[in-house]
Every structure is written in structure tokens, then in C-alpha cells.
Design a protein with these regions (language model features):
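Residue-level recognition of single "structural anchor" positions
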Residues: 1-138
Length: 138
């Protein structure tokens, strides 16, 4: 499955230089149709520096990664984006050991995250992809 159709590694690296770039992208997709507080349902909010949204009424803060496969990562969001990119554009199968070495994370963490990505890819096969493909993974 080609999640990044027409997307070269160079274009990808230019787009996602920092974890904040990744958070900004996730926020733009997550709240594309507007924000609604998950606790009280209010629609007015403040945007924080990390692109999180804080409800004006109850003060609940929601991160762009909450409720996505990137929630509670034990490594940087940029690394996670790169792993997703590699998994979706590589023709050969990647092992957790390879990913662990390449991205300097533990084998167990690599295995767990790769499982989450594979599940998201399976469940999104019938959904339309956006230009980078993450929308269907979120």
C-alpha cells in the first residue's frame, strides 16, 4: 500500500524537519472540521505552542497525538513519521530489529509501534488517502 504516492524522501524530509512540524500537521488533520472539547463539548479553545488545544470552559488540554497511533510514543514524533514513511514506501519487509537500530529505539518499542502502524494501514485500505497519507492512519 502506497501511503506516500509521489512523495520522495527529500520532499518528506523537507516537510517534517522537527517534531513541531509533525505536531502541526497532525493538528491540521485532527481539527480540520473544528475543535470540540472531549470533556464538555465546548467549541472555543486556545492553541498552545505545541499545537494542543485547551478548552476555554473546562480547561481540558488535548494534544494532536491523542487518540492517534502516535499517542504516548516513547520516542520522538519525527522518528515515528519516518518509520511510517519507510514502512509504507519500502518494498521489502522491515524487521523490528532493523528499525530499532536505524532509529535508535529499543527492539520492543519498534515492534510495538510497527504493529500499531500495520493495524492502521489494514484498517485504512478502503479510505481515501491525502497527499501524505497520514490522515487515514490517524
Amino acid at each position: 500500500m502506497e501511503l506516500f504516492k509521489g512523495q520522495s524522501l527529500l520532499e518528506f524530509t523537507e516537510r517534517f524537519k522537527t517534531d513541531l512540524d509533525c505536531e502541526e500537521y497532525l493538528a491540521s488533520i485532527k481539527w480540520e472540521d473544528g475543535y470540540c472539547c472531549r470533556k464538555c463539548g465546548h467549541k472555543k479553545y486556545q492553541v498552545r505552542k505545541d499545537f494542543s488545544r485547551t478548552c476555554n470552559i473546562c480547561g481540558d488540554t488535548e494534544s494532536p497525538t491523542t487518540g492517534t497511533l502516535f499517542h504516548r510514543l516513547k520516542f520522538g514524533l519525527r522518528k515515528a513519521f519516518y518509520i511510517c514513511f519507510e514502512m509504507s514506501t519500502t518494498t521489502k519487509s522491515l524487521s523490528a530489529s532493523q528499525v530499532a537500530r536505524r532509529y535508535e529505539i529499543s527492539r520492543q518499542t519498534a515492534h510495538y509501534f510497527m504493529q500499531k502502524v500495520r493495524e492502521a494501514m489494514k484498517s485504512s485500505e478502503s479510505h481515501k488517502m491525502d497527499d501524505l497519507g497520514f490522515q487515514s492512519l490517524i
